């Protein structure tokens, strides 16, 4: 089953609209995606503050007024920041769209960045950041990125309490001018997108004008080649658990083996009955859950294996992970297991067709990481349905067995190279 084809419409100023129409529900989703994210801006802390501040007040209304209008008209808005994307998403009812689109334009074009709201949001983000820095899963992810990309690399940037404290209102105003007003976004429309909705959305986007020399651009720095395996630990003295994150650099979407390798990784740890779950969770009881996935970004493609475990079992989890990789690479799986892998992987793919919102997300990912949405979806299906035990074994042997890997641990096993949180 193919991914529904999106309709692409050029707008003024070089902006493109990408739409998926489905009128089964009278709801539309508008996503405005700027091709710049945390790795690209001068200060990622300023970006994390600026985006939610957009709805805290404009030159003509307060943040409370904005919240009341959205709620009264059955609309809600959120912002998301990725490594190379900044996204504003708005869900709205078609019957109230005429009242919502002018509000959205005002939010985007004329934010006031009121000082009192800025201080409230600053304190909220500082508290959230400090809480996040006590979670071993997050610390292992951050350490893994430093190991893959290097300390200080754009792709390894994180927000911090001290960083939030240092951001001034003037920085937010400047970043808004350079990102929202000067950098060309893409408009994604999904749901009950009719001619009226399209026209209102496109009229709103026309008010942005053309990109200027103040525009920001993506700062993609490829990850350096990993020559040997490494293992580092972020020590969390009072932690009862250790987060394990194994990153194995691998091939990208342009490689002919890419989609076949995805299926092999799925068999290893991509579903509840996978090799890793069956052994490390069900048989050994070392963790409540362990997973493996392919994580592709503009900088690199990596196979990521991650879980949390009691400190005592950290080495056992690592050992059993290698056992399962070796077993997958050493002999073909049985017919029953192969059927489960095919069926579960295919069901997961088809689930992305459930709504126009999940469909349009495929096209947003295409912009974010460069994986072709429509053709990539077909190739993933073809490789899942044609998967053989021999091919899965071949992929595991070729790309998983003995390949250099970065093992990032965060917890309190006390036996690894310590890495400070400030690194």
Protein language model regions, located:
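Charge-rich, well-structured scaffold segments of protease-associated domains
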Residues: 10, 65-216, 252, 282-423
């Amino acid at each position: 089953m193919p991914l529904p084809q999106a309709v692409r419409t050029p707008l003024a100023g070089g902006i493109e609209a990408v739409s998926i129409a489905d009128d089964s529900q009278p709801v539309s989703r508008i996503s405005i995606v700027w091709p710049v994210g945390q790795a690209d801006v001068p200060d990622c802390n300023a970006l994390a503050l600026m985006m939610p501040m957009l709805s805290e007040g404009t030159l003509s209304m307060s943040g409370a007024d904005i919240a009341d209008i959205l709620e009264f008209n059955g609309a809600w808005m959120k912002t998301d920041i990725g490594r190379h994307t900044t996204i504003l998403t708005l869900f709205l009812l078609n019957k109230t769209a005429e009242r919502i689109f002018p509000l959205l334009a005002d939010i985007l074009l004329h934010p006031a960045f009121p000082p009192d709201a800025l201080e409230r949001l600053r304190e909220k983000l500082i508290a959230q950041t400090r809480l996040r820095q006590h979670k071993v899963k997050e610390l292992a992810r951050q350490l893994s990125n430093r190991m893959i990309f290097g300390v200080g690399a754009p792709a390894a940037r994180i927000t911090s309490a001290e960083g939030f404290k240092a951001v001034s209102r003037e920085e937010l105003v400047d970043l808004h001018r350079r990102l929202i007003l000067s950098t060309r976004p893409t408009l994604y429309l999904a749901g009950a997108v009719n001619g009226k909705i399209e026209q209102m959305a496109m009229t709103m986007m026309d008010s942005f004008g053309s990109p200027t020399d103040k525009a920001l651009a993506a700062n993609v720095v490829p990850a350096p080649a990993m020559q040997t395996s490494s293992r580092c630990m972020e020590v969390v003295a009072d932690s009862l658990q250790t987060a394990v994150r194994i990153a194995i650099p691998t091939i990208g979407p342009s490689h002919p083996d890419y989609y076949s390798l995805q299926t092999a990784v799925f068999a290893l740890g991509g579903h509840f009955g996978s090799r890793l779950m069956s052994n490390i969770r069900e048989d050994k009881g070392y963790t409540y859950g362990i997973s493996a996935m392919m994580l592709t970004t503009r900088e690199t493609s990596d196979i990521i294996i991650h879980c949390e475990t009691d400190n005592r079992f950290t080495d056992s989890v690592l050992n059993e992970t290698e056992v399962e990789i070796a077993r997958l690479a050493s002999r073909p799986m049985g017919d029953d297991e192969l059927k489960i892998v095919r069926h579960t992987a295919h069901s997961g793919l088809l689930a992305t067709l459930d709504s126009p919102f999940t469909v349009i997300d495929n096209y947003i990912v295409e912009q974010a990481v460069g994986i072709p949405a429509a053709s990539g979806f077909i190739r993933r299906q073809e490789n899942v349905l044609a998967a053989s035990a021999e091919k899965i074994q071949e992929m595991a042997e070729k790309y998983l067995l003995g390949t250099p890997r970065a093992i990032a641990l965060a917890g309190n096993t006390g036996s690894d190279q310590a890495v400070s949180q400030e690194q």
